[in-house]
Amino acid sequence: MGGMLAANTGGARLIRYGDVRHNTLGLQALLMQPPGELLEMGNRLHKNNTGPDWKQLFIGTAGSYGIVTQAVLRAHPLPRQRATALIVPSSLEAGLRLLQDAQAQFADFLTAFEGISRNALASVLRHLPQVNAPFDPLPDYALLVEVSSSSAASEHFDLDKLFM
């Protein structure tokens, strides 16, 4: 978690859940100056317009202002259903159109849209022999698309309609 806070990462599901900054409710940090001073930041209000949100200075700054010693993060419920596809677009433009179409059709159900290079796929296959190659030969680029919902079975997940 420390590395994620230091870099403000988002991961594969950033498109749905946001980055670490968005999901951090509170922090405790050991300040660089004055050395050793412990600062606690955050509160229980989701929206707080009473002044600067000081905890944001410590997220994504790689420890420049202090070292995060504790963090309180928002937890999201696990989806009750999920559909994932690994797709090889015919071109960069086709990949961008796919993103636009997925956003239009699935809206808030779109959970992940990630590009994966041939080198990344090859590395996975090299280091995880239990994983089967999804394509032969490996494409220059593939897209991981995921939709999910906390609801029971839904008609929103007609992936064939989008991808075929």
Where are the predicted features?
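Noncatalytic alpha-helical scaffold of FAD-dependent oxidoreductases
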Residues: 1-164
